[in-house]
UniProtKB/Swiss-Prot annotation:
UniProt subcellular location: Lysosome
Biological process per Gene Ontology, one example term: immune response
Pfam families: NatB_MDM20
Organism whose genome encodes this protein: Drosophila melanogaster (Fruit fly)
GO cellular component: cytoplasm; growth cone lamellipodium; lysosome; NatB complex; neuron projection
Alphabetical keyword list: Antimicrobial, Immunity, Innate immunity, Lysosome, Repeat, TPR repeat
Function: Non-catalytic subunit of the NatB complex which catalyzes acetylation of the N-terminal methionine residues of proteins beginning with Met-Asp or Met-Glu. Has 2 roles in the larval immune response: required both for the phagocytic degradation of internalized bacteria and for the induction of Defensin in the fat body. Within the phagocytic blood cells, has a role in detection of infection and activation of the humoral immune response.
Protein name: Phagocyte signaling-impaired protein
Primary location group: other
Gene symbol of the encoding locus: psidin
Length: 948
């Protein structure tokens, strides 16, 4: 240590530089060599030892790294370089509490050191210890009276009130927020408030206490005007609404809308304030409604008339006012005009914009079905395109598209007979091809084709037909059309998403994977958009292939977790109080993301199912998973649904779509699926730990057995509850609807009985129960039933190939995959049990037998248990061979019609049709062959595993 402190600073930095440089470029082996070289000359150089630990960590030599870092930490370093390297290591290992300990020791040795105290504060921020944050912030303020440190203590008090352990108690929340307000009040009286972020924090504290009048007075006062001139207008809206000051809000919004005439959010607030003013009008006053709403209508009309360029905002506001008045049973038509005429006027002005469909759809729910369909017919006439004409320019094409989309949303297509739907589909294809060849030339690679939406609409129409007939041919044709569009518009993500959905619907994982990769989903999209692929992969038939997708997703979550912590730390460093809660909420949503938790569980199950090494390698892989059967690590009540369900564009009939209900139902079912999968993983882990848990965990004798029995009880209880809940499969009425979850598959397959009987077998084997033979037979019967289900499903798939090989394909693949999953886990368990019994019997043969004169039933001998286990393994081997034979005979899906029939329907160029349909068909064939190869390789590994 003395050598380190005495070393010249420049020399110190120069000698460490090669290590830093190599670590920065990822040359970890060279960094290790350089650090060891430096340590030979300076063995007490703590920073070099810490860098050696970091190099070892990056090389994956975790045990050596841990020992090296532990040695350095025990020296209780105080120099910044060593502390920073150690902190970096502990952040990578997610051992954030150790960073706190490091800086606590350093601060004890240098109590007044501002830099060390600041690092200690940030280390408390990372572990969300708000009380400790407050104490350290006050220490900092005493050492260096800076505003930043004072407000660190204020925000720490605020977070104790709204996020801390006592935040659920109203009286505690009140105390903490009151304290925070008094702290800031004191600072204001002393004239020490200096920045806009400090002003924001004060306003936030007042709003949290519902002190809206005080907040308004501060916001409109001199100090706030000086420090926070850029306070968002929304803050004024919020306060005026809470105070019920609708008149002032109305006047403020008029001023803002005069300045910015296209702010739809402002218009909605303005209309709301007008209706609130109407409520305040005394009942005895005549024409009170006219005074308030007439002024609103006049204001909107004045903006429309005086605007040089036509903007959507005021026209939408007028439609919103009309809709609100009708909802309140006020004379909207008398005051504003005919609703249909206003929509048609809007369509004339803005129908050439792609957003027009969504805009008009906002107001359709307020009119009857007959009115909707009548309006849709008027819009089609207004577009100027008939059944015998084509759009003359891009603008007319977009208007026609908008009218068709609105027509579908009004339900005009749902009752058409099949031949009319086919004719409509043909017309949509022709419109697409005309638009592509006429208006879609010389587009940039990033542009979507102007007529692409025709093909998207056509795909939806063909799904309606396929569902009506329960046949796949129409939907397969739609898939071919979408692939054709994708060749022409490579950046159209709507086409990719629909293609991905159809591939999954048909159980074609290769095609789905291609589309998923083509989407190029990255970063936060892996959470918000990953559901379109990841949630549909499990039990699809490709265990090892799925693992790669899970790895890419999980890598984002683990890497971004560290980044999210640093974002929060940066908001403290720069005192950006307005962003703190936003970043914290973001961190919590990602940490508790259903996508993240589900991928983690499925990845571990995939690993256990796919184990192919010897028993030692398999157990090492299992131990590395760090599964704790006794501990449920999932915060079930905090799981977050981060899916962007609006990403897939839809124009389905509004009266048959309930997006909120669909989201709720699918989320509830996905959580139940996660419950089953997580509990299955923990239950299976308890089987392994019962035999190979000794030495791995510090637990009292009998704890593993108790854990197993508790988990077994939870397992059967979960299935009983799920059957009582009686969940219905997700509706599949439209192409955009989410595919059914695996919940009903898990309930229909013999998961419950299979693992329940396995639990009893494991317990009987351990105790040598007299009922072991009976239990072995029960488990053997389960294996036979599961194998027969697998073979039967494959036979059914082969038989249905003559009629329609695609329509039920996904469900058939899931049944086969689920059967093999259960049998593969069973094989892994048998190999573990067999290994343990063999080791145990060898140990006991060396000991002399002891006479046992105790009365009562005696445990079955180790030898007999081993023989029974060997018989189970032989039986399983034969069943695996039977499954392998069946899978080898599994035929690729045959299309319901021949390719020439499809080509005649496609109505595209002959040379395009041949390659297009051939490529899509080849994708299905490749997917089947790859799945069969993977499943057969899995079975070969399992046959080898149990052939002992």
């Amino acid at each position: 240590m003395a050598q380190q402190q005495g070393m010249d600073s420049a020399l110190f930095e120069r000698r460490l530089r090669p290590v830093y440089d190599n670590l920065e470029v990822g040359n970890n082996r060279k960094a290790l060599q350089e650090s060891e070289k430096l340590l030979r000359k300076h063995p007490n150089l703590l920073c070099a030892r810490a860098l050696k630990g970091l190099s070892l960590l990056r090389l994956g030599r975790y045990d050596e790294s841990h020992g090296c870092l532990q040695t350095v930490a025990e020296e209780k370093p105080t120099d910044d370089s060593t502390l920073q390297v150690l902190s970096f290591c502990y952040r990578e290992m997610e051992q954030l509490d150790k960073i706190v300990e490091l800086y606590q020791h350093a601060v004890k040795q240098n109590p007044g050191n501002e830099e060390l105290l600041a690092h200690l504060f940030i280390s408390h921020v990372r572990v969300e210890d708000y009380k400790a944050q407050q104490a350290v912030a006050l220490q900092l303020y005493k050492a260096q009276p800076k505003n930043a440190y004072y407000f660190w203590s204020v925000i720490s008090v605020v977070f104790q009130g709204i996020r801390g352990p006592e935040s659920a108690l109203p009286e505690k929340r009140k105390i903490y927020l009151g304290l925070a307000q008094r702290m800031v009040d004191k600072h204001i009286k002393e004239g020490k408030m200096e920045t806009e972020q400090e002003a924001f924090l004060y306003l936030h504290i007042l709003k949290l206490q519902n002190k809206y009048q005080e907040a308004w007075e501060f916001l409109t006062g001199e100090l706030c005007a000086k420090l926070y001139p850029g306070a968002p207008v929304s803050m004024k809206f919020e306060l005026l609404k809470e105070l019920g000051n609708w008149r002032e809000l109305n006047e403020l919004l008029q001023q803002l809308l005069d300045a910015d005439r296209d702010r739809w959010d402002f218009y909605k607030e303005y209309i709301q304030s007008s209706f609130e003013l109407l409520k305040l009008t005394p009942q005895g006053v005549e024409n009170g409604d006219k005074d308030s709403l007439a002024r609103c209508q006049e204001f909107l009309q004045r903006i429309i008339d005086s605007s040089e360029r036509k903007k959507r905002g005021p026209y939408l506001a007028r439609l919103e006012l009309h809709q609100r008045m009708r909802a309140e049973q006020l004379p909207a038509e008398k005051l504003i005009g005919d609703f249909d005429e206003m929509v048609i006027e809007y369509f004339r002005l803005f129908g050439d914009k792609s957003c027009c469909t969504h805009d008009i759809a906002l107001f359709l729910p307020s009119i009857s079905m007959n009115q909707r369909q009548a309006l849709a017919s008027k819009l089609l006439l207004e577009s100027g395109v008939t059944s015998t004409s084509l759009p003359k320019n891009k603008e007319q094409l977009q208007k026609h598209l908008c009218a068709l989309q609105i027509s579908r949303m009004c339900g005009s297509h749902m009752d058409l007979p099949a031949d009319h739907l086919l004719a409509f589909y043909t017309a949509l294809k022709l419109h697409y091809e005309h638009g592509r060849t006429t208006f879609g030339k010389k587009l940039l690679a990033t542009e979507m084709g102007p007529s692409d939406a025709y093909a998207l609409l056509a795909a939806n129409v063909m799904y309606d037909l396929s569902r009506r007939e329960n046949k796949s041919d129409h939907l397969f044709e739609a898939l071919c059309l979408l692939q054709y569009v994708l060749r022409n518009s490579t950046s159209n993500f709507h086409v990719k998403l629909l293609s991905l959905k159809i591939y999954h619907l048909f159980g074609c994982q290769v095609g789905a994977q291609e589309m998923y990769e083509y989407l190029d989903i990255k970063q936060i999209q892996l959470d918000s958009m990953g559901y379109v692929h990841c949630q549909l992969l499990a039990l699809g038939g490709r265990f090892s292939g799925n693992r790669n997708v899970y790895d890419a997703t999980l890598k984002f979550f683990t890497n971004s977790y560290k980044e999210r912590l640093e974002y929060i730390a940066l908001t403290y460093r720069f005192c950006t109080f307005s962003k703190m809660e936003e970043f914290m909420n973001f961190k919590e949503r990602l940490t508790n993301s259903l996508q993240y938790v589900a991928c983690s569980v499925e990845a571990q199950i995939c690993d256990l199912v796919s184990c192919y090494g010897n028993i030692t390698q398999n157990l090492s892989a299992y131990v590395a998973m760090s599964i704790e059967p006794a501990e449920d690590r999932i915060a079930w009540h905090e799981l977050s649904d981060n899916r962007d369900l609006g990403a897939i564009i839809r124009w389905d009939p509004l009266h048959e779509v309930d997006a909120a209900e669909e989201r709720r139902e699918s989320f509830d079912q996905e959580v139940e699926v996660l419950q089953v999968r997580s509990l299955m993983l923990r239950l299976f882990a308890s089987f392994i730990d019962l035999y190979h848990g000794a030495g791995l965990k510090d637990s009292p004798a009998g704890a593993e057995t108790a854990t197993l029995e508790l988990l077994r009880e939870s397992w059967t209880g979960l299935f009983q509850r799920l059957r009582v809940m009686n969940y219905k499969p997700l509706a599949q009425k439209f192409l955009v609807n989410l595919l059914p979850t695996r919940l009903h598959l898990l309930l229909d397959m013999p998961y419950e009985r299979f693992f329940d009987d396995l639990a009893q077998l494991v317990l009987d084997l351990q105790s040598g129960s007299a009922k072991l033979a009976e239990q072995c037979k029960r488990v053997g019967d389960n294996v036979i039933a599961t194998m027969e289900l697998c073979v039967q499903t494959i036979n059914e798939s082969n038989e249905s190939n003559g009629i329609d090989g695609l329509w039920k394909r996904r469900g058939q693949q899931q049944k086969v995959a689920a059967s093999l999953e259960m049998l593969s886990l069973y094989a892994f368990l048998l190999s573990v049990l067999n290994d343990k019994l063999q080791v145990s019997s060898k140990t006991k043969t060396k000991k002399k037998p002891v006479e046992n004169k105790v009365d009562g039933p005696q445990p079955i001998s180790e030898k007999e248990r081993s023989q029974m286990l060997q018989e189970l393994m032989r039986q399983l081997k034969h069943k695996f061979e039977a499954c392998d034979t069946a899978i080898r005979s599994w035929k690729a899906p045959v299309l319901p019609r021949d390719l020439s029939s499809f080509m005649s329907d496609m109505s595209l160029k002959p040379e395009v049709e041949a390659t297009l349909i051939g490529d899509v068909s080849a994708t299905f064939k490749d997917s089947h062959e790859l799945m069969v190869t993977e499943l057969r390789n899995l079975l070969k590994d399992k046959i080898r595993m149990v052939a002992k």
